[in-house]
Structures are given as structure tokens and as C-alpha cells.
């Protein structure tokens, strides 16, 4: 039986080094990114970044503090689904949006600033997923996330 996850948080960063702003809904623009996010229109392979809530919890446990989604600089937080299993796979968010997982979302050096000393190394292997938008639409908190079975 396929896993079905749930979207629990959305964040948009208007400028490159600015703090992510929490949203309840966002428009996913086909081939471009999330409306209002600074990555919109840049690399199609990294249009959207996702992380699992469980990984945020693990990182926080190792560092001895609560980690907010803004600290990791990822756009979407999900629970109930293994994001890494979605690499090179198409998956839906809600009833409209289709993404394709493009790879691991590796941590950047800003994790040392955002999470504190050791933050970069703790995030290694827990950074989440990068994806591109194949079909746009509205994404909202509570949307279901699931693999689209291949037709092969």
C-alpha cells in the first residue's frame, strides 16, 4: 500500500538570505517554483524543497533544542511519507499539483548560523528533497502527498 503523507508547513523566502515566512497556502507555478519565493524561475531541479518533520525532530534531539522549519530553509514540511523514496518519482500534493523529486536537498553552510555549531553536520543525510513542478496549482496546509504510480 502506498504511503500517504500530509503537508504540515509552508514557507516562502522573498530574498536570498531572508527568513522564510510561514504561509497557509501558496501557488505552485509549473516549471518555475513557488509564488513569492526567491528561487522562482531559477533552477528547475530545485524549484521546491521539502523536509520530513521526523528529520526536524531528529536534528533537534541531536542538537538539544527545538528546530523550527524556518531554520532549515526548506519550503515544505511533511509527515507520514519517506521523501527520499520520491527521488526520480512523480508525486501529487493536494488535488492539483504534481512534482517530480530531483534529488537530495543537501545542507548549506548557513546551517551553522541557523542551527548553531555542528548544525551542518547534523543536517547531513536529513536535508530532505528537491523537486520541480510539473503541474501547478494551489498548495495548502493539510494537503495529502502521495506517489503517482508509474504507468510502466
Specify the residue positions occupied by each region the protein language model found.
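Metal-cofactor-dependent catalytic cores
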Residues: 1-152
Amino acid at each position: 500500500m502506498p504511503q500517504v503523507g500530509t503537508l504540515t508547513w509552508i514557507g516562502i523566502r522573498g530574498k536570498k538570505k531572508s527568513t522564510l515566512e510561514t504561509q497557509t497556502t501558496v501557488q505552485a507555478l509549473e516549471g518555475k517554483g513557488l509564488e513569492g519565493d526567491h528561487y522562482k524561475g531559477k533552477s528547475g531541479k530545485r524549484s521546491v524543497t521539502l523536509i520530513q518533520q521526523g528529520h526536524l525532530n531528529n536534528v533537534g534531539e541531536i542538537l538539544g533544542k527545538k528546530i523550527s522549519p524556518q531554520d532549515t530553509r526548506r519550503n515544505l514540511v511533511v509527515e507520514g511519507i519517506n521523501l527520499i523514496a520520491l527521488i526520480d518519482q512523480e508525486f501529487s500534493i493536494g488535488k492539483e499539483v504534481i512534482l517530480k523529486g530531483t534529488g537530495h536537498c543537501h545542507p548549506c553552510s548557513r546551517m551553522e548560523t541557523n542551527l548553531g555549531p555542528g548544525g551542518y553536520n547534523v543536517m547531513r543525510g536529513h536535508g530532505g528533497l528537491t523537486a520541480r513542478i510539473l503541474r501547478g496549482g494551489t498548495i495548502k496546509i493539510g494537503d495529502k502527498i502521495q506517489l503517482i504510480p508509474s504507468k510502466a
